[in-house]
């Protein structure tokens, strides 16, 4: 069992990866490898990004369990993924794909003519078929 979520979560991932790759954040190396491999096979590019306890300080709060914004600045996409990870229970293998740069295409390409790209459908379908 594992969880994979896709979201147009942050504009920060666009600063990091542009419209060429989705950002992959995961607590599980095996699941990450499956996603990276599937992405290559279906031509939906994925780049693994850091997820580490050292980023927790950016969303810790003195007034609540946590805060959903990093007031210090920087590491926006990683901070958002750290926030999501806090809702994953019992060390369940989990991956988050930040697809903000991939969900829409101004110019189109080999697999679409512009507009909504459907990014992730082929990737998730391949992973599901292999289960």
What are these regions (language model features)?
Residues 1-131:
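A generic structural signal for tightly packed, nonpolar segments enriched in small/aliphatic residues
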């Amino acid at each position: 069992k594992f969880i994979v979520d896709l979201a147009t979560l942050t504009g920060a991932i666009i600063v990091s990866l542009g419209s060429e790759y989705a950002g992959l954040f995961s607590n599980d190396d095996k699941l990450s490898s499956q996603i990276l491999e599937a992405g290559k096979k279906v031509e939906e590019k994925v780049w693994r990004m850091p997820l580490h306890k050292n980023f927790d300080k950016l969303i810790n709060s003195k007034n609540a369990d946590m805060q959903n914004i990093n007031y210090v600045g920087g590491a926006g996409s990683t901070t958002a993924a750290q926030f999501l990870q806090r809702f994953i229970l019992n060390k369940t293998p989990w991956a988050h794909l930040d697809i903000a740069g991939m969900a829409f295409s101004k110019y189109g390409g080999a697999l679409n003519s512009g507009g909504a790209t459907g990014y992730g459908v082929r990737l998730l379908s391949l992973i599901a078929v292999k289960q």
